[in-house]
């Protein structure tokens, strides 16, 4: 079957891999000049299986309001001038109940754990380098109230059987020796040994090469202008330079899934949530992180690749613009310099900001639509890297008409018609 995949980020290219593995004739189009050029370009690098958690949770609205007024707020809200931003926030607030949290958490954990297994199988099948490490996540707390608040998270970890260890300040250095220099700034920690790290862009670029070896055709610099359909099925996707006829379409366009599919009268509940990162060269390996450290106060992650440190995180709701405000860059620099002052060279840091495709319930949109041959793999929010292989395998199985290995019927767009 001819399958056209829209989008060449980690979600799209991972979908391509499994579709090609299933024997389909796959073509990919993307508006940029290569793979992983937008959301997948420079994220924090965390494979956060243990911290797969909905943004929408009981108490979050109050916490979010308090954080808005910090000197270095982890969350920013700027009206984008449209009503949809307010509509999306209202839908998110509706998911901040204990009942909805449990439903959404279960769905997300299901995908993430499946994704962990897909990564394991993939690594057994290929010999790909993406500077991955399996040394866990260390969450550090600077204030005692953060330790108290983490008790709720720990209860969730226990409920879902996620291994963890609570740490005293001095014990944090067991996992991140460089933190021994700054123990006085930490009041506690939480270690999740089953988490991992890796460069999402490097993974996607290398997977792209493997897909090419399987005969997949990639067309870049393709802006979608029209989707030709008969009301039931997609016949072709037209760009400014060509027409791509197909038997099936997979939409993996991240934040732009909503705008592109709007012409089909499909209302995808996705909003772009901006994040930022700095990437700096390691200058002193002993002073750099070993794996990844999540600073709870600033909501910033510091991740070690081979010879680089990636500092990323925070969130801004301001529409589709991708400018990195100087104040946010200062926050990233402050955190890495505070915890790992001898680890890297900030004067050589590369700045980046990108848009995460967030749904109100934090769960991606995977599966069928009302068009018989249009499928979704989008809306992963901050967990696109973590969930990429699991979501992609689910998508490929659904497109192929196969039974999925885990439950997937509650991941499609139709769940929003039931709220």
Swiss-Prot record:
Which transformation does this protein catalyse, written as a reaction? a D-alpha-amino acid + A + H2O = a 2-oxocarboxylate + AH2 + NH4(+)
Reported EC number(s) for this entry are 1.4.99.-
Cofactors per UniProt? FAD
**What does the entry list as the binding residues for FAD?**
3-17
What domain of life is recorded for the organism? Answer: Bacteria
- Does Flavoprotein appear among the keywords? yes
Extract the SUPFAM superfamilies matched here. FAD-linked reductases, C-terminal domain, FAD/NAD(P)-binding domain
Alphabetically ordered keywords of this record: FAD, Flavoprotein, Oxidoreductase
Look at the named UniProt entry and state the broad enzyme category this protein falls under.
Answer: oxidoreductase
Looking up Gene3D superfamilies in the UniProt record yields: D-Amino Acid Oxidase, subunit A, domain 2, FAD/NAD(P)-binding domain
Q: Which GO terms describe its cellular component?
A: cytoplasm; plasma membrane
One Pfam family recorded for the sequence: DAO
Cite the annotated pathway. Amino-acid degradation; D-alanine degradation; NH(3) and pyruvate from D-alanine: step 1/1
Care to name a GO molecular-function term for this sequence?
D-amino-acid dehydrogenase activity
Query: InterPro entries per the record?
Result: DadA, FAD-dep_OxRdtase, FAD/NAD-bd_sf
Q: What is an annotated GO biological process for this record, any one?
A: D-alanine catabolic process
Which protein family is named in the record? Answer: Belongs to the DadA oxidoreductase family.
Q: Which HAMAP family match?
A: DadA
| Role summary | Oxidative deamination of D-amino acids.
Output this protein's name: D-amino acid dehydrogenase
> Native species of this protein?
Neisseria gonorrhoeae (strain ATCC 700825 / FA 1090)
Which classification does the entry list for the species?
Bacteria, Pseudomonadati, Pseudomonadota, Betaproteobacteria, Neisseriales
